[in-house]
């Protein structure tokens, strides 16, 4: 799972991806909700696409709306302490078990370990889809909320949808839920899921080599690639990139453009941009957003559908050379890309930014900042030094041409 430090590059390279408990998904079946009920044969939940993530909104009480990020790369569901407190299980046995349970050790995307408290959520609703007695881990989503500019109440892991046919329809900004035994044919390219424990692992191809990758809607990256055994060739890079955050801390990123074509079924991505990893390779939101992706856990298969089979092109990745941890009052520099204009201007980790192009950072949400990076030649950052402010003009550059 990736989590902030916020990497405000062309697309902010961070957050969730591949969070799992140490014993799941590879050694035992992840927990499923106690009961899943669909109020109709087709439940459509509106979603907002932010930085390649699908954020669903749910309303079922006067305390809502609630916002959840859908993370197929996670074998656990996370909720905030406030939501867990509001909806504790009323089942005495379940509640007692959760109250006495030890912290759960969770592995993040970089292989680090964090410990989170377990709980059972009495109720979770997505439109007409009701999930009861949901096993969860408690996590403070404040940093994630600050990054996205939306209050996030939880992260919905893949096992939550075990008893449904789950469709992440990125082009139409929606999530569709159907009964698991739905037999209607789904258009598109269908691939088998590779793991008996229902983890969304598929075989993809790089040139003439096949490898296993996790379908990870909780990552905003296009492809995180473990190069071991593949010996990939690069058209550009790899080079040092963003500072990204995980459950266990910040880490630098290595990014580059491959010289080969990646294939998912019969869909192709020529010369894609990849982030290098020493963990499991993943297909992230920057690629998934081109598709409607349907997960059929009942039959161990996934279907990719889009309106065209034209190659999916990867545009250049532009950057201001800095990554941030965000707060309402300022953005703190979390990392600086080596040999970037920002590094040459003397920007350092820990510096505080209060304004961008003369406007307070409170006026800069995720979408607006991304649009600026995509079009601007320079940015003017105002830095806070004690009680004094100073401005530095930083060139935007192509991190990966």
Question: Where are the regions that the model predicts?
Answer:
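Bacterial N-terminal signal peptides
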Residues: 7-18
